[in-house]
Amino acid sequence: MLSRLGARALVCLAGVAMLAASGCALMPREPLVQMPTTARAEPRPIGPASGSIFQSSYAGNPLFEDRRPRNVGDILTILITENVNASKNSGTNTSRTGNAALAFDSVPRALGGLFGTSQNANINGANTMKASGGASAANTFNGTITVTVLEVLANGNLVVSGEKQMAINQGAEFIRFSGVVNPRTITGDNAVLSTQVADARIEYTAKGVIDEAQNMGWLQRFFLNVSPF
């Protein structure tokens, strides 16, 4: 009776462990862009009318001012032009050789079996190591995304963030961007290159049948983690 209960308990524990492993395998990874991806402009207070044609209060669109973003809620176009190439090669070749010779005038009787009839000892040693390694990476990302100003810093820089979602058949693609923009780098077309954005975080992910097919199964991942090889 106890053996049956023990077997059932082991089966239950194994089932719970498999469910936990599957839950960990299906857990979504943490996105790079942690801040909100949009912001609404704050409403301007409406002041009393100061004239019949011209008003002294802020109207939102000054007459002698360009259209560059400078307030929370303004939009900005990011031209993503990322092209990163990196390579690294390293090699090591070392060798070491040592010789030592010892001579004894007399050998204790207790150690006579170690030296035999000779009273000399020679020690030789050699050590050689050769190693080489190399790594290379190439990434290219070109595209366009429109972001929103989330915050205006004290020095005038703009904290921007945005997201673009595209659903195609049974899959969905997400492009997220965040960073800090210097207003002086914004062109007359209200655009800025991604290479001129500080603390830029660019993320391109997808969800759907194609993304699921590229992921390793939870049981295979479990055995891969516990395997000592």
Curated annotation (Swiss-Prot):
Signal peptide, first to last residue: 1-23
InterPro entries referenced in this protein's UniProt entry, alphabetically: Flag_Lring
Lipid moiety-binding residues (S-diacylglycerol cysteine): C24
Keyword Membrane: yes
GO terms assigned for molecular function: cytoskeletal motor activity
Lipidation (N-palmitoyl cysteine): C24
A Gene Ontology biological process term: bacterial-type flagellum-dependent cell motility
Subunit structure: The basal body constitutes a major portion of the flagellar organelle and consists of four rings (L,P,S, and M) mounted on a central rod.
Function: Assembles around the rod to form the L-ring and probably protects the motor/basal body from shearing forces during rotation.
Identification of the protein by name: Flagellar L-ring protein
Organism ancestry: Bacteria, Pseudomonadati, Pseudomonadota, Betaproteobacteria, Burkholderiales
